[in-house]
């Protein structure tokens, strides 16, 4: 199936206007009908979320009454190219992937996500901030993975980073049988959620998948690209197609930020 590229140029975190797409194709080309869940995130027939997250003083509530800058997370969806069987969360874009994660812990994945679809792709910006190569983990990517008998229910994604949005450095992601998946995103549960006291920028507690810019030889990055690397394709019958196939993006968080 030919994918539709949806551009979200200029859709910033603070924007209160309805979602607008600037593309020769419209969002209507993507099947965003009633969501059909096949157990995604640990739920069946999962309801879509509105993507709204509590904000305070131009940022987001942090643990212990602190305020986290809005640009410690994605501030803009630069582009979104849904793959086949995408659609879940599309009506809540872009807000559903901006700001902090809404983790569900070991047993249940977040429903505050957008499904990329089979081989779908999304590009995010953290501008005006930037991810910098500092001590240890620099970037966290949050999917809605959960554990079944201690084994990750993984929907994998390949993560790339860029400082200019043109030249990319990619963390190698080679899907395999598991139960661990190397530098792929999408296999660690997420524990941080608004109001639960777990900092979304603490890699020791937040959950999600960790990335170090040093591993790809980059000193700074302002853009993050995620591509679905799942191995489950869509059903052939149009009437049986779910809208939850592929990597389900909850959020990204900047651990080592140019402006903390």
Model-predicted regions and their roles:
Residues 166-167:
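Residue-level signal for well-ordered, solvent-exposed loop/turn and beta-edge residues enriched
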Residues 51-157, 170-260:
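A domain-level signal for the mature, folded cores of soluble proteins
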Residues 1-5, 15-64:
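Ser/Thr-rich, Pro/Gly/Ala-heavy low-complexity intrinsically disordered linkers and tails
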